[in-house]
From Swiss-Prot:
Species of provenance: Neurospora crassa (strain ATCC 24698 / 74-OR23-1A / CBS 708.71 / DSM 1257 / FGSC 987)
Family (UniProt): Belongs to the eukaryotic ribosomal protein eL38 family.
Any Pfam family hit: Ribosomal_L38e
One Gene Ontology term from the biological process aspect of the record: translation
Protein name: Large ribosomal subunit protein eL38
Amino acid sequence: MPQEIGDIKKFIEICRRKDASAARIKKNKATQQIKFKVRCQKYLYTLVLKDSDKAEKLKASLPPSLTIADVAKRNKKQTA
C-alpha cells in the first residue's frame, strides 16, 4: 500500500527502521522529479524531490544496510 512522505527527516527515519528492506530511486527527466521509494513491511513510502542537489545528499545519507536500486524509464510496448 503506498504512502507519500513530505518531510526528508521523517523519510530518513523510515529508512533506518528494521522493516525497511529496499529502496528505489526513480528519475523523471521530463518533469525534473526524483522519487525515492522505500519498501517496508506494510507500506511503500515515497518521497518526491525536485532539487537534484538534495536528492544526491539524500542518496548518500541512506543507510548502507538498505538495498538501493536506480530504476530507469521503461520503454513503451509497441502494438502490432
